[in-house]
A protein has these predicted regions:
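Ligand-site clamp/hinge motif
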Residues: 185, 215-263, 391-393
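Aromatic- and charge-enriched surface segment that lines or borders ligand/interaction sites
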Residues: 83-127, 144, 150-152, 244, ...
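N-terminal lobe/hinge region of extracytoplasmic solute-binding protein
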Residues: 38-88, 119, 192-194
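Detector for C-terminal structural segments
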Residues: 43, 203, 207, 276-281, ...
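Surface-exposed binding/hinge segments that line
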Residues: 4, 10, 86, 132-176, ...
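Gly/Pro-rich hinge or "lid" segments in bacterial periplasmic/extracellular proteins
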Residues: 71-72, 165-225, 229-231, 349-350, ...
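Structural transition elements
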Residues: 196-197, 292-293, 325-358, 376
Length: 517
């Protein structure tokens, strides 16, 4: 596959019209220390306990704190509202709660609030978005001292700190109960968080305004954010976002496609930044024969041929672009445990043809490749596969259709991506896709499933690394996947906005500031 993709004419036209008709104004909020950011998708709640959207995660990191947080530099899980923690044994975790943390209503955070929060999540009737996940590993929580809480786990679970950091913001005791609570936990009203910003105004599906919380605890790594007010405007159409950025209506666009970023970043009043993302693209092959017991993909040499046939380097360089890189194994290179030393499959179409012949398919065969995103990349894959004699029918469908067919185990091959929830740990990628019983697992490899499960049932670092290496090598040896590439994130900013690009694709806006220039 050799291609240099031209910028689509539609995007050229949009930029030409926008540049010609809209004045390039001062930033939306520099003069009054306000930051205005475009959200592509609406939020119906500001409560992270009832939202799984990426936008909800971004907002929650401003308005909420959990006991732990993701260090933006190391991507490791470290204490936040927790002062310290200790593993008493593999299934008992004790956490000391800080004594200088205040809710936005002025009340002080207590151990009772932490117990209340997790008991609410453990209550099946609360219907929290991550409740089933937490309930799968957490048996109970209890107050063990004036500022100490004890977590009693059902089993050893190394990602407990991750779940607390990403999914469970601390709530004040009684938030969801009684006359002072909320009858509908996800209804359109602000919540009482402990983050560096508090909700000032929330119009569901339209706009969220937050303001700096001056009584935020100084020991936090999020303390003293520079920007006083932030506004998140819901603007689903990227063309409209471009117009707003150029006219000064917003200060930032996120998740900008490379061709759009190429096209308008050279205009005055626009700055471009590129960063990494934990998301990876991959192709799954039906090695188990779920879709058809006679599918050629049950043969190892066929799967190896597919791996050699796809020019991942050029797809990554010319189509994904930015900071994207080819990934050799079934995980993101920045994730803990993503250290395989098994076989890799360099682009070699002639070897791919030989392998097909050895597998009994000298003239190739026909199959459907399913996809739901990045059609141009899926088309490039199809082009490469046709070069080795395969008759590939690209079935490009919407995500809901794709998910149903995939979950029904009725795909011979599919191209997809996975963001691991922004988690820098192989359990969120390798573990999700190759666990026994996973709808994403098309291997029927019981030993592999046991290996990834074992890696999620020990808190010993060295043992986890060994188990993930074993799993990744097995996946590579059997060519169950075609690991493709990591993704690159593009951001378009107003001049003068200082914004550290995140390593995991999840912006930390408390780090943003306006320069004096």
């Amino acid at each position: 596959m050799r291609t240099r993709t031209p910028v689509p004419f539609k995007n050229q036209l949009i930029s030409a019209v926008v540049a010609g008709l809209l004045p390039v104004c001062a930033s939306a909020g520099k003069d009054d220390n306000t930051l205005v950011v475009a959200f592509e998708k609406p939020l119906t709640t500001v409560d992270r306990l009832y939202s799984i959207q990426r936008e909800g995660l971004i907002l929650s990191r401003l308005t909420d704190d959990g006991l732990f947080y993701v260090n933006p530099d190391s991507l490791e899980f470290e204490p936040l509202a927790a002062e310290s923690y200790e593993w008493i044994n593999e299934t008992t975790l004790e956490v000391t709660v800080r004594d200088d943390v205040f809710f936005h209503d002025g009340s002080k955070l207590t151990a009772e609030d932490v117990v209340y929060t997790f008991e609410w999540v453990l209550d099946e009737n609360s219907d929290t978005s991550r409740g089933p996940v937490i309930q799968s590993w957490l048996e109970s929580i209890e107050k063990a001292g004036p500022r100490t809480v004890r977590f009693n786990l059902r089993l050893p679970y190394p990602m407990a700190l991750r779940d607390m950091a990403i999914s469970i913001p601390v709530r004040k005791k009684g938030t969801y109960e009684g006359a002072d609570g909320m009858e509908n936990a996800a209804e359109d009203r602000p919540l009482n968080g402990i983050g560096p910003y508090r909700i000032k105004d929330f119009s569901a599906g339209r706009e969220i305004v937050i303001e700096r919380f001056d009584n935020y605890y100084q020991a936090s790594p999020k303390a003293n954010p520079a920007i006083e007010t932030m506004v998140f405007r819901v603007i689903p159409d990227q063309g409209t976002q471009q117009a707003e950025l150029l006219s000064g209506g917003i200060d930032m666009m996120m998740g900008v496609p490379p061709d759009v970023a190429d096209n308008i970043s050279h205009l005055p009043g626009v700055e471009r930044k590129e960063g990494n993302d934990i998301r990876i693209g991959y192709i799954t092959l039906d090695a188990a024969g779920y879709s058809d017991p006679d599918t050629p993909f049950t043969k190892l040499k066929v799967r190896q041929a597919i791996n050699h046939a796809i020019n991942r380097e050029e797809i990554t360089r010319y189509l994904v672009r930015g900071s994207a890189e080819v990934v050799p194994y079934a995980c993101h290179p920045r994730q803990f445990g993503c250290e395989g030393d098994g076989p890799v499959y360099p682009y070699n179409p002639e070897k791919a043809k030989r392998l097909l012949k050895e597998a009994g398919y000298p003239d190739g065969f026909a199959f459907k490749l399913w996809a739901y995103r990045e059609k141009i990349i899926a088309e490039a894959v199809v082009s490469d596969l046709k070069e080795i004699g395969l008759d590939v029918d690209l079935r490009f469908v919407k995500l809901n259709v794709f998910a149903k067919v995939r979950n029904d185990k009725d795909m011979e091959a599919f191209f997809a991506s996975y963001g691991s929830g922004g988690t820098a740990d192989a359990s969120a990628s390798t573990g999700v896709h190759f666990a026994a019983g996973s709808a994403r697992n098309y291997t029927d490899d019981e030993a592999l499933g046991e290996t990834v499960l074992a890696a999620e049932r020990t808190i010993e670092v060295a043992e986890r690394k060994r188990l993930y290496r074993e799993a990744l090598n097995r996946i590579a040896e059997q060519a169950y996947w075609v690991p493709m590439f990591s993704y690159s994130q593009n951001y378009l900013l107003s001049p003068g906005l200082e914004f550290p690009v995140p390593k995991d694709g999840v912006p930390r806006f408390w780090q943003a500031s306006w320069s004096d220039q």
